[in-house]
């Protein structure tokens, strides 16, 4: 069965968004140019406006896609760890602060990759960024069902900040040590037997 023009256009649109979702995590918002994204997607720069009204519209969609991809990857990791019988919180901490996150900038959490850039963006991109942050906090709260929203916010901030600093140190012993220390501290604080979370 042949694809319709609308199907081809949608597939092309999805390819552009996928490329941009990786690019914003790899280069930050400022490092994402329309021409580069289109070239990496195997398209000409001129075709961009058949899919998006503006670069800002692309960034919003790319951030949403990056968040969905990261969320799906974390969910898969949680399911694998849950099969081992660990708590949801332990699974989340182990997945988010796993050593493999040091080298997976373009496929990892967009909040950790872009938090420093978020305040300097347009209103639309900042709004999409705020949605990602709220979803991260909600995910932490779901893993710690007895925790307050404030506690979930602190834990989310610890996860993001630790990952950012560990990446700044690099995919080396120092970066891995920082992740390990944060995992241990978070699990001791919130996942130890008899721990009361507020």
Question: Where do the protein language model's features map onto the residues?
Answer:
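Hydrophobic/aromatic residues within well-ordered alpha-helical segments
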Residues: 62, 66, 70, 85, ...
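Hydrophobic/aromatic-rich alpha-helical bundle segments in the mid-to-C-terminal region
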Residues: 122-131, 143-198
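Hydrophobic alpha-helical connector segments
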Residues: 61, 75-107, 155
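Helix-turn-helix
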Residues: 15, 22-57
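Short hydrophobic clusters on alpha-helical segments that form packing/core surfaces
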Residues: 16-24, 96, 159
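Amphipathic alpha-helical segments used for helix-helix packing
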Residues: 88-91, 102-123, 127
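N-terminal intrinsically disordered/low-complexity leader segments
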Residues: 1-11, 193-198
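Generic hydrophobic, amphipathic alpha-helix propensity
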Residues: 12-21, 37, 62-66, 70
